[in-house]
């Protein structure tokens, strides 16, 4: 099993500049047989993301979604020099 660690060579996505807690799920959308999640950033912009996209500042990868939630797994430091752990998080659907 590979060690858990963020990929330093991966190009960051737009929503990774915001803290996880500042992002809000505001809806879902199905277009061309793809299910999308609508996420609102703290500046008021609404973004279309799907499973596999990243958001938040802790390498948060979207791993699942439903009509009322987005499941994310972040990679965060475990407090040691080179140690990392996975931390599951959820964003629930909120009102506009």
Each PLM stretch: what is its role?
Residues 1-96:
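Extended low-complexity, proline-rich intrinsically disordered regions
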């Amino acid at each position: 099993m590979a060690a858990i660690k963020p990929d330093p060579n991966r190009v960051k996505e737009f929503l990774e500049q915001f803290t996880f807690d500042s992002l809000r799920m505001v809806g879902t959308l199905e277009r061309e047989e793809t299910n999308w999640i609508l996420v609102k950033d703290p500046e008021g912009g609404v973004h279309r993301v799907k499973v596999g996209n990243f958001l938040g500042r802790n390498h948060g990868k979207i791993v699942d979604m439903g009509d009322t939630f987005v499941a994310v797994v972040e990679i965060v430091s475990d407090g040691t020099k080179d140690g990392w752990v996975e931390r599951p998080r959820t964003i629930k659907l909120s009102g506009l």
